[in-house]
Amino acid sequence: MSNEYVALITARGGSKGLLRKNVLPLHGIPLIGWTIKAAQGCSYISKVFVSTDDYEIAKISEGLGALVINRPEELATDTASSIDVILHAISWLEQKEVQKYEGMILLQPTSPLRTSHHIKEAIELYEKTAAKFVISVFEPTHTPIKSYLENDDGTISGLYSNEAPYQRRQDLPRAYQPNGAIYAFSIDEFKLNNHFPRNKVFPYVMSEVESADIDTLEDLRKVEEQLKIKEINK
C-alpha cells in the first residue's frame, strides 16, 4: 500500500463545552497530542496536518511534529461547517504541497483512545472494500432501531418500523452511531460533491469505550483513569 494518505486534524481554539479542551493535559500530553501521535504512528499516512485558528494549538502541534494549516477566522466560528474547513485544507494542500494525496483521513482531536492501529485498520478496510467512505462507529448499548419518532399530531411511530420497538434486538438489523474518531475518503470525490460520499459507505467498528469523545471535564477524567489502568496493565 502506498503512502498516498494525508491526515487532517481539525482543532479550533474556541469550544463551548470544555474551554481550551484541545490543549488540556491528558496523562501528561495535551489532548490534541494523542491524535497527532496516533496519526504519526500509522505507516499508511504520509504527513499529518492540523487545521487551526489558534496560536497555542499551532505551536503544540508543530512541537509534536505536525504541519499546521492556518485557518481563517470565518472558518473558526460556531457556525462554520466542517465541509468548508475540509475544502479549505484541500485547497491549501494543493497550493503548498508538491505531493498529490489520493485519500484524506480526518481525525477529531477529542478522540484520544483512537490509536494508530485503528487508523491502519480503517484504511485497510477502505482499500479492501473499494469504499468511497469509511467512518468509525460503535454499536450503542440501546439500539436506536427500537426508538420512536413524534408525528405532527402528537402520536409516535417506530423510527425503523412500527414493529421494531416490540421486536427482540437480535431480530433487528445492527445500528451504529458515529464516534467522530476516523473518516477516510477520496479527496477528488470530496471536491467533486462538496460533501462526504453518500454511497459505498462502510463502518469501521470500534468499542464504546474506545469511542470516548472529550466534551466535558468528566469525560476527560474518565479517560485519564482508563489510560492509567491501561499503563498499569502493560
Which functions belong to the PLM regions below?
Residues 31-47:
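A short, N-terminal amphipathic alpha-helix
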Residues 55-103, 114-117, 121:
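Short phosphate-binding loop-to-helix
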Residues 45, 98-101, 128-131:
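Short, high-confidence coil segments that cap the C-terminus of an alpha-helix
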Residues 84, 112-200:
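Conserved core of the sugar-phosphate nucleotidyltransferase
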Residues 203-205, 209-234:
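Hydrophobic helical membrane-anchoring modules
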Residues 44-49, 132, 209-211:
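Short active-site oxyanion
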Residues 1-19:
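N-terminal nucleotide-binding beta1-loop-alpha1 segment
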